[in-house]
Regions:
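Nucleotide and nucleotide-moiety/phosphate-recognizing core
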Residues: 2-8, 17-131
Length: 131
């Protein structure tokens, strides 16, 4: 049996739907991004997320049966956005019998800055959307 080598990751905690498909590089413990998209979706994640996931998988040339795991953003962020993300991820993971991992949205943003070369302290700020 061949080893599954792809990860599906997405987040809807904020006003953007972020979706990515990556190849697990087991030898180097890294992930090579094959397809990704960020789409504005102010209060519309529930109507756009599945289509964006399907499009990312198609762009990457990866079938759902080739996925090794699912990762989803777990906030902080919009309460409804986090619930949409978590419920979708749980449904996909259960339906495909895959492990599911929750990732802090703040950690993901900080690690993105590290990958872009930032060193030292990194502070992630987010709009609390309160007036």
């Amino acid at each position: 049996m061949s080893q599954k080598n792809y990860i599906l990751a997405f987040d809807t905690a904020n006003e953007i739907i972020a979706v990515g498909v990556g190849k697990l590089e087991r030898e180097t413990a890294t992930i090579k991004v094959l397809a990704s998209c960020e789409t504005p979706a102010f209060r519309a994640s529930n109507t756009k997320l599945i289509a964006k996931i399907d499009a990312a998988l198609e762009d990457a040339g990866v079938a759902k049966s080739e996925l090794a795991c699912v990762a989803c953003g777990r906030g902080p962020g919009s309460f409804t956005g986090v619930r949409i993300c978590t419920a979708t991820a749980k449904g996909i993971a259960l339906g495909l019998d895959l492990p599911l991992f929750g990732v802090s949205t703040l950690d993901a943003q900080a690690w993105d800055q590290w990958a872009k070369g930032a060193r030292g302290e990194v502070v992630v700020l987010g709009d609390a959307m309160r007036i």
